[in-house]
């Protein structure tokens, strides 16, 4: 125990001297608004133009000297991308108006409430937009009640307005709908401000802030009932809120005329002082995001009744660069992987060496290779990020491999080993027919190209966020190095490199865990108590609700997903052939199952540790973080000491390259064995048969060419993804991969366990599987099952249809023992 305490103390000391990375908001002067400035104008962005309209001021004398408030009707436009930007008077409102609220939607700027020309509160609303070089004003339905200084925010095309204790929503994309009233706030809030930002459990909420208190209401992906109270330890009365990044809300200025910038983090429910914005307007200013991501603070009030025309532009800038030691470690790692490819190239004398490593690899090396293959960079980044933003309920997926490992060893492994298969899909021809084999192999190769692209693209985003290199450069480097050592070294280089990468992954995760817990208030006890109080350790939720990730949903989904991976994925099945005997392969599967389960425990708790760390240190978070999946790599890059950060990033690269190398070699193996060898070499003469040296050379050459082509296609697709909107594409593509992979798992399951299913029945079952999965994926309806159940429901349909179709089309030889069907 004393030694353990010493380790914690040492880690805490190292952590204490670390220079933490920060993102600062740096301000520069922008063109001033003509005139003396206004308070609470309507402001937003439309088609690249900043539009600012209305507002109020005291043009003659300040209110303390008897001055009268003047409402404005001018509309100004600013092109922030121009070489010499300036505010231009581009139109006027139908009548003077001011002290209302506004928010930007895709169609323009929603302007709501305020004071009318007579100085009376109004419920009028309109849409202000910039079209064809001029302003366009389109009337919107009136609010059900007048609202002076309403709180306005937007999410997509939907605008939200809060006034007093009443809240409304309007979908500006639906011209036929009017304002719809939502649940009332628990209390009336005078001078409220609003913002929309992401919250835990992958939801989006509307926030309405008052003085020391705020309330949040979930509005997406599904609107929920009931407001949640948000405590604000820092006073922000009348401060202008602005949602930034994926999880932060900044508050600018406020009463009594402060120039402070505060920040609220929605996931950890923490608020802190972010910066001081000297010289900026302090109250009633227009604060908005420009098209290029910068922040504009325009006009407002600097003292009671004293307006200012001054405008400022804020730019986020990093204050810390990555240490050269980290770069050196990453470069050495990539160089070592390339050297490994050259080293094992000398051992490849034939196709059997290239694709199966000559069957001479130790079981413990193969086991860690399977672990590294299944534990991709997506897993490395997404599991901690998922737990950080929610809880541990998805842990039920991890029980799947524990349940399936003995099943694979007892029933699946003997088939693959005794048939001495290079490609997993050779079995499908023996069991069903050639068409099933070719279909499965072709589908698998397409899966590998797509998976290569996704697995390359996502870590490239992470590397770009950490060290600032261009995403495209990162994709090219990772793809090139992986193709090099995979092409030269074959599967033996892949497996030994996977072994090295597994060691890096395991040691790296231990280091991360130590630093996260040491950086949490209270250390280990603080980590446990803080996580428990927030429900972050919740695993077992036995609610009978198939629309949510309750335990039985995640467990069933995990079993089906692992069934497909460990029985029909060439990446994994190929490794069963690389040990000297079946006993060694069985050991590798069982050991990998235990290791993977323990690894899940570590990475799910790392997600909790990230949450407790940033709840203790919210000021260390990057407020510009664009997506939740970036939280882990940003911690690695910003909050770990030099050297340690480089080793961990090498672990991220290891996870990426493990999956990529497995994908490339498996795709080459499938194409060479199922297409080239089966369809081309089989028709050759005896002298050029597969036993000849010439035939082996051809297989080896074909495998290397296919490895390069698959890598180039995958890398090219990754470059396409990097230069377009990819979030929805990635989500949809993941579902697509899951549907088709589950179908292949069905084929192998029926082949081994359903002896009377013939080729016609198997095909009919696959059609039923795809029909169910695609229908679930592409349709929306009340009570729709959770995504994790799509594969299970598709497999159920397959297992029902296939036996029926086989019974209707049975031939005399159907159902005979496998060896008699050869």
Describe each region flagged by the PLM.
Residues 1-8:
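Bacterial N-terminal signal peptides that target proteins for export
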Residues 2, 21, 820-822:
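Short, intrinsically disordered terminal tails adjacent to the first/last structured region
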Residues 2, 14-15, 427:
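Compositionally biased, low-complexity segments enriched in small residues
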Residues 5, 17, 24, 84, ...:
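Intrinsically disordered regions, especially transient/low-confidence alpha-helical propensity segments
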Residues 11-20:
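Hydrophobic h-region of N-terminal signal peptides that target proteins for export
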Residues 18, 158-162, 208-210, 251-253, ...:
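Short, intrinsically disordered, charge-balanced linker/junction segments flanking boundaries
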Residues 21-322:
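Kelch-like beta-propeller repeat domains
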Residues 317-822:
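Membrane-embedded helix-loop-helix hairpins and adjacent transmembrane boundary segments
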């Amino acid at each position: 125990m004393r030694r353990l305490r010493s380790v914690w103390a040492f880690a805490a000391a190292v952590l204490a001297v670390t220079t933490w990375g920060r993102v600062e908001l740096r301000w520069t002067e922008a063109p001033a608004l003509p005139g003396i400035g206004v308070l609470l104008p309507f402001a937003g962005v439309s088609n690249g133009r900043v539009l600012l309209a209305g507002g109020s001021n005291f043009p003659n004398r300040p209110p303390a000297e008897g001055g009268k408030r003047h409402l404005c009707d001018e509309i100004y436009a600013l092109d922030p991308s121009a070489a010499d930007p300036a505010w231009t008077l581009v139109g006027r409102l139908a009548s003077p108006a001011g002290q209302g609220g506004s928010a930007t939607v895709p169609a323009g700027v929603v302007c709501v409430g305020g004071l009318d020309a007579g100085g009376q509160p109004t419920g009028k609303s309109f849409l202000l937009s910039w079209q064809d070089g001029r302003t366009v004003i389109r009337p919107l339905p009136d609010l059900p009640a007048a609202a002076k200084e309403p709180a306005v925010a937007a999410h997509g095309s939907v605008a939200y307005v809060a006034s007093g204790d009443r809240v409304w929503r309007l979908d500006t994309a639906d011209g036929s709908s009017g304002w719809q009233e939502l649940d009332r706030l628990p209390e009336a809030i005078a001078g409220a401000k609003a913002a929309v930002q992401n919250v835990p459990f992958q939801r989006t909420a509307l926030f309405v802030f008052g003085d020391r208190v705020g309330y949040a209401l979930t509005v997406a992906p599904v609107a929920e009932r009931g407001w949640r109270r948000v405590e604000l330890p820092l006073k922000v009365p009348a401060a202008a809120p602005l949602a930034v990044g994926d999880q932060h809300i900044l508050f600018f200025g406020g009463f009594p005329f402060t120039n402070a910038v505060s920040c609220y983090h929605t996931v950890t429910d923490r608020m802190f002082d972010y910066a001081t914005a000297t010289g900026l307007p302090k109250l009633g200013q227009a604060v908005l995001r420009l098209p290029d991501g910068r922040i504009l603070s325009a006009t407002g009030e600097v003292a009671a009744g004293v307006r200012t025309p001054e405008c400022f532009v804020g730019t986020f800038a990093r204050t810390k660069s990555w240490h050269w030691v980290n770069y050196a470690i990453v470069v050495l790692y990539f160089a070592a992987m390339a050297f490994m490819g050259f080293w094992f190239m000398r051992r490849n004398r034939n196709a059997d060496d290239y694709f199966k490593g000559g069957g001479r690899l130790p079981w413990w090396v193969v086991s860690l290779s399977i672990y590294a293959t299944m534990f991709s960079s997506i897993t490395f980044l997404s599991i901690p990020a998922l737990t950080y933003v929610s809880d541990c309920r998805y842990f039920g997926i991890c029980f799947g491999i524990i349940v399936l490992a003995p099943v694979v060893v007892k029933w699946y492994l003997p088939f693959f080993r005794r048939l001495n298969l290079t490609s997993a899909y050779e079995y499908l021809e023996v069991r069903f027919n050639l068409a099933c084999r070719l279909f499965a192999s072709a589908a698998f190769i397409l899966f590998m190209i797509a998976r290569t692209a996704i697995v390359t693209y996502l870590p490239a985003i992470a590397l770009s966020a950490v060290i600032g290199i261009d995403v495209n450069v990162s994709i090219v480097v990772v793809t090139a190095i992986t193709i090099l050592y995979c092409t030269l070294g074959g599967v033996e280089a892949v497996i030994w490199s996977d072994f090295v990468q597994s060691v890096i992954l395991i040691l790296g995760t231990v280091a991360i865990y130590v630093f996260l817990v040491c950086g949490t208030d209270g250390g280990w006890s603080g980590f446990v108590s803080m996580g428990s109080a927030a429900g972050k350790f919740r695993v077992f939720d036995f609610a009978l609700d198939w629309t949510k990730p309750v335990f039985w949903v995640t467990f069933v989904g995990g079993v089906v997903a692992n069934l497909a991976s460990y029985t029909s994925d060439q990446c994994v099945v190929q490794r069963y052939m690389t040990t000297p005997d079946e006993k060694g392969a069985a050991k590798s599967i069982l050991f990998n199952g235990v290791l993977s389960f323990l690894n899940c425990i570590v990475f799910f708790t790392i997600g909790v540790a990230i949450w407790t760390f940033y709840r203790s240190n919210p000021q260390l978070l990057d407020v510009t973080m664009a997506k939740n999946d970036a939280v882990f790599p940003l911690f690695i890059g910003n909050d770990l000491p030099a050297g340690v950060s480089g080793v961990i990033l090498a672990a991220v690269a290891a996870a990426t390259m493990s999956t990529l190398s497995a994908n490339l070699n498996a795709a080459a193996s499938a194409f060479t064995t199922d297409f080239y060898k089966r369809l081309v070499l089989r028709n050759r003469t005896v002298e050029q048969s597969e036993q000849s040296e010439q035939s082996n050379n051809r297989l080896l050459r074909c495998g290397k060419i296919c490895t390069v082509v698959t890598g180039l296609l995958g890398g090219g697709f990754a470059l396409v993804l990097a230069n377009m909107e990819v979030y929805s594409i990635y989500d949809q593509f993941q579902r697509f991969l899951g549907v088709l992979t589950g179908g292949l798992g069905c084929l192998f399951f029926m082949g081994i366990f359903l002896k009377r299913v013939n080729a016609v029945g198997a095909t009919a079952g696959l059609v039923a599987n795809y029909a169910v999965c695609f229908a679930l994926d592409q349709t929306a309806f009340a009570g729709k099952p959770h995504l994790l159940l799509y594969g299970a429901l598709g497999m159920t349909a397959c297992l029902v249809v296939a036996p029926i179709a086989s019974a209707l089309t049975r031939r005399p030889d159907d159902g005979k023992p496998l060896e008699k069907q050869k």
